[in-house]
Amino acid sequence: MKKIAFGCDHVGFILKHEIVAHLVERGVEVIDKGTWSSERTDYPHYASQVALAVAGGEVDGGILICGTGVGISIAANKFAGIRAVVCSEPYSAQLSRQHNDTNVLAFGSRVVGLELAKMIVDAWLGAQYEGGRHQQRVEAITAIEQRRN
């Protein structure tokens, strides 16, 4: 992924800056969807901004941070075409791309520290969707999404 939308709430604000710097060092273009301060805010807004950018093709994928990664990933998954995963270790991040074709990664700043967050991001960005036997399952998820909408 060459272009990423990034969003967080106030809890993820400090970690976001560190991860954005890490991404830029790797040559990834980052579109910052907020928040831009540590003042209290609500994560659904930032999940929405990132999900819309991903679903609309503005970016290749998205990264979200809140306290645990759970709430912000739930909000992102409400958008058609979004397959957001919350990860607290690199192996799940890698497999989520390889097997589930995830396009949004979420994690919690209260759960992972900076070095682990970098490892999770690197594993996710470094993995490619394998298709094959996994394609049928991804298509089944998309069919559920289409029936719901």
UniProtKB/Swiss-Prot annotation:
On induction, the UniProt comment says: Induced by ribose and repressed by RpiR.
**List of catalytic residues:** 66, 99
What domain of life is recorded for the organism? Bacteria
Reactions the enzyme catalyzes? aldehydo-D-ribose 5-phosphate = D-ribulose 5-phosphate; D-allose 6-phosphate = D-allulose 6-phosphate
- Tell me the GO molecular function terms: D-allose 6-phosphate isomerase activity; ribose-5-phosphate isomerase activity
Q: Which GO terms describe its biological process?
A: D-allose catabolic process; pentose-phosphate shunt, non-oxidative branch
The residues that the entry says bind D-ribulose 5-phosphate are: 9-10, 67-71, 100, 110, 133, 137
Q: In the Enzyme Commission scheme, what number(s) does this protein have? A: 5.3.1.6
Keyword set, alphabetical order: Carbohydrate metabolism, Isomerase
Report the function annotation for this chain: Catalyzes the interconversion of ribulose-5-P and ribose-5-P. It probably also has activity on D-allose 6-phosphate.
Record protein name field:
Ribose-5-phosphate isomerase B
Q: Which gene carries the instructions for this protein?
A: rpiB
